[in-house]
């Protein structure tokens, strides 16, 4: 079995796959790659199954060395195109700081073969379910390759425009024009955003009802509004329950964009056409 030696890391490197959907009733978040299409592309390039585990690399800084020769692919932040590359035995690969975006993905033929927890190899950074964050000195097992690499593949082109949202279950807790104000107002990504949620800076949304809800189930992409009135978009490691009202839900097809937004960048929302999901 091949192994990957971690020589250096940046701000955050974790193992991710498609996550743990369907376990919210047990109090387990979905987790998984923040930019799911980029992770799937990396796997496709090296011949892996779509649910193989990859390394999610926040703002670069990762350097690894493979014990045996292997096919690798890097996608996501700062990558206009991608292709599989052969990494010789003993050679190292370094992912630098991207010029744009946040989350990059490193796939290796055979996938990262850490033991699965609750059906997934993903790290949940809120509950710390799954493997520990990847640190220098870590040695990661690699599975047996079972597919053909692809020399070149074209990532999806960035979809220009705002994040599409659906009306949330607690829209009636807000002023009649709250959703329109959300969609008409530019927000800015806050510095404390992470895998749990995209935190925003901008004007507060006005509520018509006082008090708080009993905790209820939350979904990926929920636009939750805390007492400050400034919305938060729940991402992969969001808590399964929450007590603040949800005004809207971001269309899942657009959530990958949240993985590539840097602090200080502008975010806009728009009402999703009916049936966009």
Residue ranges and their predicted role:
Residues 1-277:
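Conserved "landmark" site that anchors the functional core of diverse proteins
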């Amino acid at each position: 079995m091949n192994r990957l030696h971690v020589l250096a890391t940046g701000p955050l490197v974790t193992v991710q796959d498609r996550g743990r959907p369907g376990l919210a009733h047990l109090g387990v978040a979905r987790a998984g790659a923040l930019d799911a299409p980029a992770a799937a592309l990396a796997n496709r390039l090296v011949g892996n199954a779509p649910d193989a585990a990859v390394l999610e690399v926040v703002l670069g800084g990762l350097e690894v060395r493979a014990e045996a020769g292997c096919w690798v692919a890097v996608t996501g932040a700062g990558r206009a195109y991608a292709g599989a590359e052969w990494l010789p035995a003993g050679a190292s690969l370094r992912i630098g700081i991207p010029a744009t975006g946040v989350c990059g993905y490193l796939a290796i033929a055979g996938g990262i073969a850490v033991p699965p927890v609750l059906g997934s190899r993903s790290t949940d950074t809120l509950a710390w379910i799954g493997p520990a964050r990847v640190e220098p000195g870590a040695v990661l097992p690699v599975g047996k390759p079972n597919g053909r690499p692809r020399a070149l593949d074209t990532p999806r082109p960035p979809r220009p425009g705002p994040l599409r949202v659906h009306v949330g279950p607690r829209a009636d807790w807000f002023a009649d024009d709250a959703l329109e104000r959300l969609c008409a107002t530019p927000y800015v990504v806050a510095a404390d955003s992470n895998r749990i949620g995209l935190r925003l800076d901008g004007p507060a949304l006005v509520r018509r009802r006082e008090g708080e809800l009993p905790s209820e189930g939350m979904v990926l992409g929920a636009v939750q509004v805390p007492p400050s009135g400034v919305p938060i978009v729940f991402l992969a490691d969001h808590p399964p329950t929450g007590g603040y009202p949800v005004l809207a839900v971001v269309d899942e097809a657009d959530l990958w964009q949240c993985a590539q937004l840097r602090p200080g960048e502008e975010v806009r929302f728009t009402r999703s056409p009916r049936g966009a999901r």
